[in-house]
């Protein structure tokens, strides 16, 4: 039976203002396959492709005194069983994000997501916040870029909301495979382009709407690259940071104006306009 090398991380309450950003930024250096945070933010399970990556991340976590980590091996069937037990359809405004085993009938537009290593099942606050901010924009005839697409959920939401040209970008081949499956599952394979690239090498036509559900540290580091992807008068939706860090994120984009914000628990999201 296949097993995933993983870390179980316990975060001591109360979490500091920038602790989640620090943790995400540290883990990002070791290329996790998936980060699965509990809704209260106090426990994370982080999956890796190799035990070497997991073990290196485990050693690095010693630098963050607010967390305790343990190395585990998670059987493939445990992941599947847990997701089917725990994940149900989630509403976000006019949209519903649902796993294949809990698809609701009628009413709102449904995005079907098969949980895998691509982040974005709709259960984490950052995904929901991005979905809600996206629904505040008129996407008809818009070109939309989803940078760090993960499961493809935000790209699919843009398509469902009327965007005529959607591009999903990620640097993780496993996430892109999951995104490709989800996009096909929702009948959008011909409507959404999928690109493997990094922000510092991405060369692509600019868009009216750019979404980046990443981490605060990554958003600040690649602020110039994200800014360059937005057309004049266009919008940038960002999430993956704490409410107390909203000002820091806004200052990273000095040419853009914050026009909307949302918060949920320990997470926040912003819409900026160029």
Which residues make up each language-model segment?
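Conserved beta-strand signature within the Rossmann-like core of class I S-adenosyl-L-methionine
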Residues: 233-241
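Conserved SAM/SAH cofactor-binding pocket of Class I
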Residues: 117, 121-203
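Active-site capping/gating segments
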Residues: 241-274
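Short alpha-helix immediately C-terminal to the canonical SAM-binding loop
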Residues: 176-177, 219, 246
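Conserved beta-strand elements of the Class I
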Residues: 111-112, 145
């Amino acid at each position: 039976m296949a097993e995933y090398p993983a870390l179980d991380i316990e975060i001591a309450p109360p979490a500091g203002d920038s602790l989640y950003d620090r943790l995400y930024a540290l883990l990002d250096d070791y290329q996790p396959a998936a980060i699965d945070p509990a809704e209260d933010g106090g426990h994370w399970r982080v999956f890796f492709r190799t035990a070497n990556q997991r073990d290196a991340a485990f050693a690095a976590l010693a630098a963050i005194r607010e967390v305790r980590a343990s190395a585990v091996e998670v059987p493939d069937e445990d992941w599947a069983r847990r997701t089917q037990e725990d994940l149900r359809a989630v509403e976000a405004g006019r949209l519903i994000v649902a796993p294949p085993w809990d698809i609701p009938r009628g009413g709102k537009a449904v995005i079907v997501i098969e949980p895998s290593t691509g982040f974005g099942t709709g259960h984490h606050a950052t995904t929901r916040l991005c979905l809600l901010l996206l629904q505040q924009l008129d996407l008809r005839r818009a070109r939309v870029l989803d940078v760090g697409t993960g499961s493809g959920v935000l790209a699919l939401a843009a398509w469902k909301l009327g965007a005529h040209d959607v591009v999903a970008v990620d640097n993780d081949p496993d996430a892109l495979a999951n995104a490709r499956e989800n996009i096909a599952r929702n009948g959008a394979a011909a409507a959404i382009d999928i690109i493997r690239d990094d922000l510092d090498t991405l060369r692509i036509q600019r868009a009216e709407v750019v979404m980046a559900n990443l981490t605060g540290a990554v958003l600040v580091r690649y602020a110039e690259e994200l800014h360059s992807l937005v057309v004049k008068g266009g919008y940038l939706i960002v999430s993956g940071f704490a409410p107390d860090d909203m000002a820091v994120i806004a200052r990273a984009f000095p040419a853009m104006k914050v026009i909307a914000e949302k918060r949920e628990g320990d997470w926040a999201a912003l819409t900026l306009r160029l």
